């Protein structure tokens, strides 16, 4: 039993166009799918691969059934399939397959090839099966140690600065400008005027008691101003 071409309705069909859902002979296939590039990409299934012995249709029981409806769980011929699954009806959305297990009205060949390639490509499966690689953890920031060293350097610099400041103020401390008890060397010593030998002899001559006619007159202390310097003379009591 052969399937008739849906275009010319004279020659037997050699293939089925899934996009057009039509059985075509070789001549009509060239005319229909050579019209444009989009039509040339339609997926087509050759009927040579189908079995020559088809089961009878579950509805009419006369014609050979090569369409299987999943929802109705029935094998249908083309005429019964069109009558049962008419467009704009609820049954039009039923899933239907050819007797070989290939779904009817699939998308274009290029789309199916991409789907099959992604589905059966071992490289894609390996990429999907591989767990996501964990990125190495970023190194912990070194701000704590840097801050510690910076603070230590700051403390050292402050200590050195204090030592320098104290070193500069040592000479003020030696002069007794602060409230601390000064050293004995820093205290000013009262200087005793140095007298030359001539001054001492001259002073000794003045220390001698002068003879006076007045016996009861008391001895007086005399002061002598020499070179605009005041000298205190101790009387000789011997």
From Swiss-Prot:
Pfam families: zf-B_box. Zn(2+) 2 binds at residues 57, 60, 80, 85. One of its GO terms (cellular component) is nucleus. A zinc finger (B box-type) spans 5-47, 57-99. Residues 115-139 are annotated as: Disordered. One of its GO terms (biological process) is regulation of DNA-templated transcription. Disulfide bonds: none annotated. Changing residue 72 to A: Abolishes interaction with HY5. Changing residue 20 to A: Abolishes interaction with HY5. Residues 226-238 are annotated as: Interaction with COP1. Its main location: nucleus. One of its GO terms (molecular function) is DNA-binding transcription factor activity. Acts as a negative regulator of seedling photomorphogenesis. BBX25/STH and BBX24/STO function as transcriptional corepressors of HY5 activity, leading to the down-regulation of BBX22 expression. BBX25/STH acts additively with BBX24/STO during de-etiolation and the hypocotyl shade avoidance response. Interacts with COP1 WD40 domain. Interacts with HY5 and HYH. PANTHER family: B-BOX ZINC FINGER PROTEIN 22 (PTHR31832), B-BOX ZINC FINGER PROTEIN 25 (PTHR31832:SF47). This is B-box zinc finger protein 25. It comes from Arabidopsis thaliana (Mouse-ear cress). The lineage of its organism: Eukaryota, Viridiplantae, Streptophyta, Embryophyta, Tracheophyta.
């Amino acid at each position: 039993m052969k399937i008739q071409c849906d275009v010319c309705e004279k020659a037997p069909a050699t293939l089925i166009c899934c996009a057009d859902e039509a059985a075509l002979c070789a001549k009509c296939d060239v005319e229909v799918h050579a019209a444009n590039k989009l039509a040339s990409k339609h997926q087509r299934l050759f009927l040579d691969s189908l079995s020559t012995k088809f089961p009878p249709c579950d509805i009419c029981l006369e014609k050979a059934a090569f369409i299987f409806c999943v929802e109705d769980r029935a094998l249908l011929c083309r005429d019964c399939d069109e009558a049962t699954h008419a467009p704009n009806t609820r049954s039009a959305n039923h899933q239907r397959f050819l007797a070989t297990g290939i779904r009817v009205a699939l998308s274009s060949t290029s789309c199916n090839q991409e789907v099959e390639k992604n589905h059966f490509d071992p490289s894609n499966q390996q990429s999907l099966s591989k767990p996501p690689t964990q990125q190495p953890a970023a190194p912990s920031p070194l701000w704590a140690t840097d801050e510690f060293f910076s603070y230590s350097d700051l403390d050292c610099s402050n200590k050195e600065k204090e030592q320098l400041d104290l070193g500069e103020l040592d000479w003020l401390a030696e002069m007794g400008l602060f409230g601390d008890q000064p050293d004995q060397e820093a205290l000013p010593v009262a200087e005793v005027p140095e007298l030359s030998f001539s001054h001492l002899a001259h002073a000794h001559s003045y220390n001698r008691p002068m003879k006076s006619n007045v016996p009861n007159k008391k001895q007086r202390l005399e002061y002598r101003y020499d070179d605009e310097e005041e000298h205190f003379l101790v009387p000789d009591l011997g």
